[in-house]
Amino acid sequence: MNAHKERLESNLLELLQEALASLNDSELNSLSVTKVECSKGKHHAYVFVLSSDHKILSKLKKAEGLIRQFVLQASGWFKCPKLSFVSDNSLEKQLRLDAIFNEIAKGKDND
């Protein structure tokens, strides 16, 4: 990954967290953005949030225009990527892997 793309994703992550905190909806402004992945042309960004609730993801989709407007004003950029909000399930995967490794470790200890 090139440095420019990493910088863009990092800046966008910070701006999105600020944008969510500025919203009037208590469910949205308490969300955590865990990761941002921009497309190669930087016209589209996947925003990973810690929520598996489809209702929250739907609210985020409705608020996309306000969030993009905030990002544009705060950054001074000419254009903001289109945002797609995605549930981040990496924590759940990590917990499952930890449980599997613990089972393996218990099995080796019993041998």
Swiss-Prot record:
InterPro entries (UniProt xref): KH_dom-like_a/b (IPR015946), RbfA (IPR000238), RbfA_dom_sf (IPR023799), Ribosome-bd_factorA_CS (IPR020053)
SS bonds (residue pairs): none
Primary location group: cytoplasm
Pfam families to which the protein is assigned, alphabetical: RBFA
GO cellular component terms, semicolon-separated: cytoplasm
Cellular location(s): Cytoplasm
UniProt superkingdom: Bacteria
Keywords (A to Z) from UniProt: Cytoplasm, Ribosome biogenesis
GO BP, sorted A to Z: maturation of SSU-rRNA
Subunit description: Monomer. Binds 30S ribosomal subunits, but not 50S ribosomal subunits or 70S ribosomes.
Reported function: One of several proteins that assist in the late maturation steps of the functional core of the 30S ribosomal subunit. Associates with free 30S ribosomal subunits (but not with 30S subunits that are part of 70S ribosomes or polysomes). Required for efficient processing of 16S rRNA. May interact with the 5'-terminal helix region of 16S rRNA.
Protein family: Belongs to the RbfA family.
Name used for this protein in its record: Ribosome-binding factor A
Lineage, broadest ranks: Bacteria, Pseudomonadati, Campylobacterota, Epsilonproteobacteria, Campylobacterales
